[in-house]
Amino acid sequence: MTYKKLHEWDLSPEEAMKIQNVLREKILFKPFEGEPKYVAGVDLSFPKREEGLAVIVVMEYPTFKIVELVSERGKVDFPYIPGLLAFREGPLFLKAWEKLKTKPDVVVFDGQGIAHPRKLGIASHMGLFIEIPTIGVAKSRLYGTYREPENRRCSWSYLYDNEEIIGCVMRTREGSAPIFVSPGHLIDVESSIRLVKSFTLPGRRLPEPTRMAHIYTQRLKKGLF
C-alpha cells in the first residue's frame, strides 16, 4: 500500500509538537456508511529499548478470518515521550504498510485517535498518511474526562475535552477495565463506537483486529511465528 509523505521523522520533541498542531487542522470527521469488507489491526511492540516491531493484520468482516499479515522490525530513534508516540512508532508502521497488498476499509490502532492533548494520536496521525478511515482503541486514558460506564458488556459513556465529545469509554466485558475509543481520521465518533462494538466478540476485552495484531506481535517477538 502507498501513503502520502507529510513530513520527515528526524525531529526534536519541540518540532514534533509543532507538526502535530499543524496536522490536527487537517483531520476530517465523517460517518462510516455500511459495513467494511476488510478491517486492519495495528500493534507495535519494543523487543529492545531501541528496536521496534510493527504488525498489521487484515481480516475479513464479519468472519474475522485473517487474509494478510505483515510486519516490520527495525531501529527506533525517537525517544518514548507520552503524546508523541506516533513519532516513535509511525516510521515502522509505514514500512509495514508498504508491504501490505490488501486494502482495508478501516484501520484500528492500539493507541489514541483524537483523545490526545493536541488531538493527534497515532490513529489520527497515521490516518493522514494512509488516507483511510482510522480508529484509536487504547487500553488506558491519555486525555479527556468521562463518567465510568456501567458494569455490563458494551456499556459506554462519552469521553470529553471540556464540552467537546472526543470519543467514548467502553466496557467490552463485564468486570473488566474499559477501553478508550476515539476517531482517528475520516470517521466520526458515532461510527467509531458502532464499529468497535461490532469488532469486539463476547468474552473479549479488545476488538479482534488489534487483539490479533497483539497476539502476532508477541509471537514474532518470541520467535514463535
Curated annotation (Swiss-Prot):
The keyword Metal-binding applies. Mg(2+) binds at residues 43, 110. Pfam families: Endonuclease_5 (PF04493). GO terms for cellular component: cytoplasm. CDD domains: Endonuclease_V. It catalyses: Endonucleolytic cleavage at apurinic or apyrimidinic sites to products with a 5'-phosphate. Keywords: Cytoplasm, DNA damage, DNA repair, Endonuclease, Hydrolase, Magnesium, Metal-binding, Nuclease. Gene3D superfamilies: archaeoglobus fulgidus dsm 4304 superfamily. It comes from the Bacteria. DNA repair enzyme involved in the repair of deaminated bases. Selectively cleaves double-stranded DNA at the second phosphodiester bond 3' to a deoxyinosine leaving behind the intact lesion on the nicked DNA. This is Endonuclease V. It comes from Thermotoga neapolitana (strain ATCC 49049 / DSM 4359 / NBRC 107923 / NS-E). The gene is nfi.
